[in-house]
């Protein structure tokens, strides 16, 4: 499966490879005289055969030049293709740089990230009950794993310590107290995030893409307040069982969610100042590839 993904990504990059190859070959053709290509006579026997077929209008020297130029083109294409295959096979991270930000997207486990502030996404009510019911935190989720490794966490106490005011609007789930999606509550070096709105059954559902993006923009504003001159690590928010859209919504691929996260961060006036980095930690998945991200 990995080999097929690499080949598919290579096919999609073939246009870019062609541009690179044509650029290199054009430079060589511009500065290297034809006489150099004429001196390479490996094709003399073929040249003589072609001249015999087509007559004396073509010289052996001219045919040698044509073949040697084609050989150069093939060699350069081969080198660039092999280089891309190696890159696509072993890529583990992609860095995106702007005038005022650095984003690193990489495979990994956010709970193993070090030397940074980790953003751990909860729902809008900061639910801490772990289980398999729709309204409970799943043990396999990042939030579930975090709660299991921090069994004594006192989220109400953390909320009280920063004098955080609940949102005026109650949650759709049992009319519980909720916090604005994108709100951060510090827990030591970790940043607990109120994120997914809950529906009547307690499942995470963003009613629309707009609400999802609004939550991201508010998150960037909150990070500006709490990142404390450190790198910040986030997961691909909403990539678990959270849905986006009208009604029950639909599951969105990691790739699409990542695109929205990156674009919203680029557009936000609130960013983590250089040289510090926003790290986006991704899990390896069949519908996701770092090769689809344009580094710059």
Feature-to-residue mapping (PLM):
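Macrodomain-like recognition of ADP-ribose-binding/processing modules
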Residues: 2-296
């Amino acid at each position: 499966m990995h080999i097929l993904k690499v080949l598919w990504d290579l096919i999609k990059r073939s246009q870019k490879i062609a541009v690179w190859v044509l650029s290199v070959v054009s430079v060589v053709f511009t500065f290297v005289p034809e006489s150099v290509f004429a001196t390479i006579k490996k094709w003399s026997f073929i040249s003589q055969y072609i001249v015999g077929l087509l007559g004396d209008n073509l010289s052996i020297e001219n045919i040698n030049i044509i073949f040697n130029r084609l050989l150069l083109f093939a060699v350069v294409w081969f080198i660039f293709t092999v280089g891309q295959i190696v890159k696509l096979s072993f890529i583990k991270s992609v860095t995106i740089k702007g005038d005022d930000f650095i984003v690193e997207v990489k495979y990994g486990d956010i709970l193993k990230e070090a030397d940074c502030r980790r953003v751990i996404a909860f729902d809008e009510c900061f639910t801490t009950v772990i289980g398999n019911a729709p309204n409970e935190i799943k043990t396999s989720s990042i939030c579930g794993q975090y709660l299991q490794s921090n069994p004594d966490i006192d989220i109400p106490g953390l909320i009280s310590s920063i004098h955080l005011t609940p949102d005026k609007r109650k949650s759709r789930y049992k009319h519980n107290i909720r916090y604005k999606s994108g709100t951060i509550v510090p827990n030591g070096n970790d940043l607990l995030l109120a994120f997914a709105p809950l529906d009547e059954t307690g499942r995470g559902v963003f009613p629309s893409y707009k609400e999802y993006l609004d939550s991201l923009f508010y998150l960037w504003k909150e990070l500006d307040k709490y990142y404390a001159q450190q790198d910040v690590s986030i997961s691909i928010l909403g990539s678990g069982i959270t849905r986006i859209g009208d009604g029950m919504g639909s599951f969105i691929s990691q790739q699409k969610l990542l695109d929205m996260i990156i674009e919203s961060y680029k557009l936000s006036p609130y960013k983590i100042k250089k040289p510090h980095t926003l790290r986006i930690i991704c899990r390896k998945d069949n519908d996701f590839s770092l090769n689809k991200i344009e580094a710059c």
